């Protein structure tokens, strides 16, 4: 399949509008051309600074604009982060993601996050951060410290975006992704379904992602988790088949990207998740919590993997581990 960056909305809509089973079959066929069919990349996400975010994202418990009852926490110590990363690796994660509720990191924060990247990288884990907007200098320093991925989601279509966020623009997000790409890091960018958007908005989101100069290496497809106290607390729940359609279309138009099951997975049945894997999802966040929202725990995931015959993608060994293996050979 030829890799394309010129997908039109009409083409993407034609994929969405296929009969459900035809769409899932096509997505699984594309998936098998580029990935091992039964291998899932497992990531762990840790909040390194929680709450009091100045942004007004209407879905988010961490926004200072809403009364979500979330207790804000100061940034956590680097050694605590390293301990959590080591535990994540031992439980089967190959990528460790660190998120801070900032509009953007201040210069005083940079030594803290750079040390964190270096220490987590030394464990043999892929590293990812989501810290808000970046300038080019910050992106380059993160890359030099060893950061593999930077997450900055588009959230929704350009047209629907202003209904969800007013404190940063859609182009602000694209600019940060440009800085990440130019620094040589891998881009992690996706969105959220179930925000009250239309299917046309989901098409618009995927078109933005699939027409970037390089497809994002990782594409999280989140299901809204309604949070009490936020403006979207009472939004009508999206049917799960529409979420699976979105995953399938993402797989077809971005065949080399990891498509990740992210927020909202905790409320899904094993059968729903199996369909998502059939539709081409091959990455997920494991652990009891995603920043501040509930998530399927490691024990549930181990049972699910065993039931479906799935295996976790392996983390890379550290230099020390390679040395021990060489000595015992």
From Swiss-Prot:
Comment on bound cofactor: Binds 1 [4Fe-4S] cluster. The cluster is coordinated with 3 cysteines and an exchangeable S-adenosyl-L-methionine.
EC number: 2.8.1.6
SMART domains: BATS, Elp3
Pathway annotation from the record: Cofactor biosynthesis; biotin biosynthesis; biotin from 7,8-diaminononanoate: step 2/2
UniProt similarity note: Belongs to the radical SAM superfamily. Biotin synthase family.
Binding site for [2Fe-2S] cluster: 97, 128, 188, 260
Catalytically driven reaction(s): (4R,5S)-dethiobiotin + (sulfur carrier)-SH + 2 reduced [2Fe-2S]-[ferredoxin] + 2 S-adenosyl-L-methionine = (sulfur carrier)-H + biotin + 2 5'-deoxyadenosine + 2 L-methionine + 2 oxidized [2Fe-2S]-[ferredoxin]
Keywords: 2Fe-2S, 4Fe-4S, Biotin biosynthesis, Iron, Iron-sulfur, Metal-binding, S-adenosyl-L-methionine, Transferase
GO BP terms, alphabetized: biotin biosynthetic process
UniProt source species: Acinetobacter calcoaceticus
CDD domains for this protein: Radical_SAM
Encoding gene, per UniProt annotation: bioB
InterPro entries reported for this sequence: Aldolase_TIM, BATS_dom, Biotin_synth/BioAB, Biotin_synthase, Elp3/MiaA/NifB-like_rSAM, rSAM
An example molecular function term from Gene Ontology annotations: iron ion binding
Record-linked Pfam families: BATS, Radical_SAM
Binding site for [4Fe-4S] cluster: 53, 57, 60
Name this protein carries in UniProt: Biotin synthase
Gene3D superfamilies in the record: Aldolase class I (3.20.20.70)
Signal peptide: none
Subunit organization: Homodimer.
Residues forming coiled coils: none
Domain named Radical SAM core: residues: 38-262
Lineage of origin: Bacteria, Pseudomonadati, Pseudomonadota, Gammaproteobacteria, Moraxellales
Biological role: Catalyzes the conversion of dethiobiotin (DTB) to biotin by the insertion of a sulfur atom into dethiobiotin via a radical-based mechanism.
């Amino acid at each position: 399949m030829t890799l394309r960056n010129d997908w039109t909305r009409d083409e993407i809509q034609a994929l969405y509008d296929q009969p459900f089973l035809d769409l899932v079959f096509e997505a699984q066929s594309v998936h098998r051309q580029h990935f091992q069919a039964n291998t899932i990349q497992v990531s762990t996400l840790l909040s390194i600074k929680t709450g009091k975010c100045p942004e007004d994202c209407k879905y988010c418990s961490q926004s200072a604009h809403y009364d979500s009852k979330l207790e804000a926490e100061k940034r956590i110590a680097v050694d605590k982060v390293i301990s959590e990363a080591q535990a994540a690796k031992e439980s089967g994660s190959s990528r460790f993601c660190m998120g801070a509720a900032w509009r953007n990191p201040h210069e005083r924060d940079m030594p803290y996050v750079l040390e964190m990247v270096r220490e987590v990288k030394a464990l043999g884990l892929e590293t990812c951060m989501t810290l808000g907007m970046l300038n080019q200098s910050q992106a380059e320093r993160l890359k030099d410290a060893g950061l593999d991925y930077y997450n900055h989601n588009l959230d929704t279509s350009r047209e629907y975006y202003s209904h969800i966020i007013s404190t940063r623009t859609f182009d602000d997000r694209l600019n940060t992704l440009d800085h990440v790409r130019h620094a040589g890091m891998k881009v992690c960018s996706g969105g959220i379904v179930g925000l009250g958007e239309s299917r046309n908005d989901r098409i618009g989101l995927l078109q933005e992602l699939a027409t970037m100069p390089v497809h994002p290496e990782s594409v999280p497809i989140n299901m809204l988790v309604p949070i009490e106290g936020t403006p979207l607390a009472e939004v009508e729940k999206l049917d799960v088949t529409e979420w699976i359609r979105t995953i399938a279309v993402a797989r077809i138009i971005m065949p080399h990207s990891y498509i990740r099951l992210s927020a909202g997975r905790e409320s899904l049945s094993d059968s729903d998740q199996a369909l998502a894997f059939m539709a081409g999802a091959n990455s997920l966040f494991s652990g009891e919590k995603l920043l501040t929202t509930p998530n399927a725990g490691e024990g549930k995931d181990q049972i699910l993997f065993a039931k479906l015959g799935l295996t976790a993608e392996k983390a890379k060994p550290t230099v020390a581990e390679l040395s021990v293996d060489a000595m015992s050979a």
